[in-house]
UniProtKB/Swiss-Prot annotation:
Extracellular compartment residues: 96-113, 163-256, 322-344, 397-405, 531-550
Taxon lineage: Eukaryota, Metazoa, Chordata, Craniata, Vertebrata
Stated name of the protein: Acetyl-coenzyme A transporter 1
Predominant location: endoplasmic reticulum
UniProt-recorded Gene Ontology molecular function terms: acetyl-CoA transmembrane transporter activity; protein homodimerization activity
Topology in the lipid bilayer: Multi-pass membrane protein
Compartment(s) of residence: Endoplasmic reticulum membrane
InterPro entries in UniProt: AcetylCoA_trans_1-like (IPR024371), AmpG_permease/AT-1 (IPR004752), MFS_trans_sf (IPR036259)
Pfam families xrefs: Acatn
Organism, as annotated: Rattus norvegicus (Rat)
Keyword Phosphoprotein: yes
Length: 550
């Protein structure tokens, strides 16, 4: 199942998660020690300092260790910026569930899934964000302020168009192409804002308190995603609002997507103006030289890293390692909605998972802290593959327990337990990969190196999900019942079948075909390539060190 609450990993990719379509966590917070203070130097150096307007000047920073209370305003600002970042991510994650309730094809869902790619690809333009800026305005504000203004204006404009795009007017079908382009731009802007905020976080806080940046990231984006996804889906549902929040039933929910977009667009504009006016970036006398030239240097460095035999082997293996999970992760949640499970109920099932998603990385990191973190990845993989079959069984069972348009409480308990077990295996693999990436990254270029490895890891989950969604319809076999000599292979044939008094009945659901094939591919990878993946741990440090030519 795909997640309702999705984090972005501290590479900083998130997620996301990636972000999936209904219940799956693509990633989570870093294990303890995953935040590297030395990354500060790679982003902006200690020459960049930010102070509130009217605070002490750059030369007045105390030498003694600073309490977090002294920087509470900066910590709260970071937290709020990450909450804002989570809003468009959560909204984008809710759209597939809304589309599924409108019976769009899985081919359309596959097309829309490209929306979740920008966070995995932001490494392509991150060097530009780091190096190009207006010195007088501030290195990070040069990107943060215009990006958030564009997001706010975009949201307000979209609030006037979204009902038409979703087909809520005059019974039209959803305009999936326009929705995909729109939310792809949303995700692109959110990813750009993420680059700017991550960089600002490392210099806004003192070196003693920079670790709070990771906490702000994880907590803030989770809260934002919750607001934009879980809370929105609940308040948008007329059934949910009438059942739990109203005394008199109404034909629609408390809020609409149009209302939600307008509200948050206004919040973006107001708060961005306040940040632009009240929060200043100041620099000490030292100036980072040749930053523009650094763009070219960074891209050359990335190419040099990926050409290394050990890194290339890692990339090829990790890009194929998640094929076995693609049907379970990308399609299951949508199938449950198709079978009648209310989308807002699926979203709310993620709420009790939050404590588990916080605790799991802490527990698992104890077993990945040694010299061979990939052993946990290898051991968890077959259990996660088997849970994919359990998910398929759950989808098959769902219509059999539906009663009077609803589902009994024991059904939701079983779904929740299945999701919890899935989270254990998912986090075991995720924390294992993060620990390995941190272990092998060349400390001299740690920020760039680890970001590259984590980007490839996240792409390894994105492309199989898109392919899995795209293949559901071609693999599904439907028969025309009630009209002779007809089939249901094309949309035109389906319409003709209906006109002749027949109906199209699914004889073989492509989801079940995919589930079995994916698990077989997954076990094939685990048996033949898994040992080679583990063997990467035996490579010496020299295999992972990049030889730079200056």
């Amino acid at each position: 199942m795909s997640p309702t609450i999705s984090h972005k990993d501290n590479s900083r990719q998130r997620r996301s998660g990636m972000f999936g379509h209904a219940l799956d966590m693509k990633s989570g917070p870093l294990p303890p020690g995953g935040w590297d203070d030395n990354h500060q130097d790679s982003v902006g150096g200690e020459g960049d300092r930010e102070v509130l307007l009217g605070d002490v000047g750059p030369g007045d920073f105390p030498k003694a260790k600073r309490s977090y209370r002294a920087e509470l305003s900066s910590i709260l600002l970071l937290l709020f910026l990450y909450v804002l970042q989570g809003i468009p991510l959560g909204l984008a994650g809710s759209i597939p569930l809304i589309l599924q309730s409108k019976n769009v094809s899985y081919t359309d869902q596959a097309f829309f899934s490209f929306v979740f790619w920008p966070f995995s690809l932001k490494l392509l333009w991150a060097p530009l964000v780091d190096a190009v800026y207006f010195k007088n305005f501030g290195r990070r504000k040069s990107w943060l302020v215009p990006t958030q203004y564009i997001l706010g204006i975009f949201m307000i404009y979209l609030s006037t168009q979204v009902d038409r795009l979703l087909g809520n007017i005059d019974g039209r079908t959803p305009d999936v192409v326009a929705l995909t382009v729109t939310f792809f731009l949303f995700e692109f802007l959110a990813a750009t804002q993420d680059i700017a905020v991550d960089g600002w976080a490392l210099t806004m806080l003192s070196r003693e308190n920079v670790g709070y940046a990771s906490t702000c990231n994880s907590v803030g984006q989770t809260a934002g995603y919750f607001l934009g996804n879980v809370l929105f889906l609940a308040l948008e549902s007329a059934d949910f609002c009438n059942k739990y929040l109203r005394f008199q039933p109404q034909p629609r929910g408390i809020v609409t997507l149009s209302d939600f977009l307008f509200f948050w667009g206004t919040v973006f504009l107001i708060t961005t103006t306040l940040v632009a006016l009240l929060k200043k970036e100041t620099r000490e006398a030292s100036v980072v030289k040749e930053e523009t030239q650094g763009i070219t240097d960074t891209y050359k460095l990335l190419f040099s890293i990926i050409k290394m035999p050990a890194v290339l082997a890692f990339c090829l293996l990790i890009l194929t390692s998640k094929i076995g999970f693609s049907a379970a992760d990308a399609v299951t949640g949508l199938k449950l909605v198709e079978e009648g499970v209310p989308k807002e109920h699926l979203a709310l099932l993620a709420v009790p998972m939050v404590p588990l998603q916080i605790i799991l990385p802490l527990l698992i990191s104890k077993y990945t802290a040694g010299p061979q973190p990939l052993n946990i990845f290898y051991k968890a993989m077959p259990y996660r593959l088997l849970l994919g079959l359990e998910y398929a069984l759950l989808v098959w069972w769902t219509p059999k327990v539906e009663h009077q348009g609803g589902f009994p409480i024991y059904y939701y308990i079983i779904v929740l337990l299945s999701y919890a077990l899935h989270q254990v295996t998912l986090y075991s693999m995720y924390v294992s990969i993060m620990a390995f990436n941190a272990k092998v990254s060349d400390p001299l270029i740690g920020g760039t190196y680890m970001t590259l490895l984590n980007t490839v890891s996240n792409l390894g989950g994105n492309w199989p999900s898109t392919v899995a969604l795209w293949l559901v319809d071609p693999l599904t076999v439907k028969e025309c019942v009630g009209a002779s000599n007809q089939n249901c292979r094309t949309p035109e044939a389906i319409e003709l079948c209906k006109k002749l008094g027949g109906s199209c009945v699914t004889a073989l659901d492509g989801y079940y075909v995919e589930s079995i094939v994916c698990v077989l591919i997954g076990f094939g990878w685990w048996f033949f390539l898994g040992p080679k993946f583990k063997k990467l741990q035996d490579e010496g440090p020299s295999s992972w060190k990049c030889k730079r030519t200056n």
